[in-house]
Amino acid sequence: MAKVTGLPEFEDLHTKRKWMLNHMAAAFRMFGRNGYNEGTAGHVTVRDPIDENTFWINPLEVPFSLMKPSDLVHINSDGEIIGGSKMKYNTSGFAIHYEMHKVRPEVICVCHVHSIYGKAFSALGKPLDMLNTDCCVFYNNHGIYFDMDDVISMPEEGRRTAKGLADYKAVLVQNHGIMTVGTTVDEAAYLLSLMERSCQIQLLIDSATKVGERKHVHPTRAKAIRENADNPVGLYTAQQPNFLYEVACSNGELEII
């Protein structure tokens, strides 16, 4: 069994790229296993470790559950395909993500899916309540992007979404769904799955209780939990059981680097 704690270090950036693409493909398989797919909607962008002005993104025609490293598409900052599988990808999605990468240069990965509970909760136009300790990683750590009535360009949509994200790790895009960011694919993917479950839990609680009956995590405790949990090593480590599961189920299409 591979070591799952701590971020790996690489002397060779080509090896790091191979590692990154395996983890990216595994994240998509996890999204598919959890039912986060909606047709061709949903995309992940990852900054390339060799040329940091270029990115990797998923192709439109490959199902999340079947994603392989060789399927992923390498593009430059203008959205031009420069390598990888060279299959068609969501150009509008990249235009939005690119603006977020520009505003937050420390962000390596941006994840966005059209998951059921994320879409449902986003329609409320409000942030998550801290109703359990797991979701406290999002305490004062997620924003809201309120969709405007006007029709705008994708780059402008990206700039507005980036404003909603601010310095946080996640943003709820009203009537649309969840976006998360991280310094690794694993961090962003884990945060996305955690936010999706947190939306599900809050919707369950909202349907079963009156406002005054709910018990919130005390702000002091919520802040302490976030400060302890919200770090690149811890969030990367939290995703590794999911990664190893997808490798084991991949019939050799994914590998541990």
Curated annotation (Swiss-Prot):
Database matches in PANTHER family: ADDUCIN, MEIOTICALLY UP-REGULATED GENE 14 PROTEIN
UniProt entry tagged with the keyword Isomerase: no
Main location: cytoplasm
SUPFAM superfamilies: AraD/HMP-PK domain-like (SSF53639)
Source species: Schizosaccharomyces pombe (strain 972 / ATCC 24843) (Fission yeast)
GO annotation, cellular component aspect: cytoplasm; cytoskeleton; cytosol; nucleus
Record-given protein name: Meiotically up-regulated gene 14 protein
GO biological process terms, semicolon-separated: actin cytoskeleton organization; meiotic cell cycle
